[in-house]
Amino acid sequence: MVTGGIAPNTEGGVFPGAAGLFDADDVANHKIVTDRVHGSDGKIAMQILHAGRYAYGPNCVAPSPIKSPISPFVPAELDAVGIEKQIDDIVTTACRARDAGYDGVEIMGSEGYFINQFLVLHTNKRTDQWGWLL
């Protein structure tokens, strides 16, 4: 079993209040789910999903400030420190998933979400080490 997308931080959530794994309280809540699955001899992985420009909220962030067709919000362009923070938050979320008892993680890197936004020229207009336009 694989969960639906779990946000690594508030700015990466699909919408404000979206499911996340941000702190020890969230770990405890997720452990309730993983314990139930394991109690039935099942396995469960957690999908980490950072929505990037697809987030439906005013605090969304992305490689470049290009509005998505599915959200009215223009994302804030991340600087290098902000990009590193997003990476660190994804790693921290994977570690919290382990602590919550998940058997694995899947990091969503396709379908136009955050990681994919770095890989596509249309959504990445950067000229630094994180961009296509070097």
Question: Where do the PLM segments sit?
Answer:
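Flavin-dependent oxidoreductase catalytic cores
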Residues: 1-134
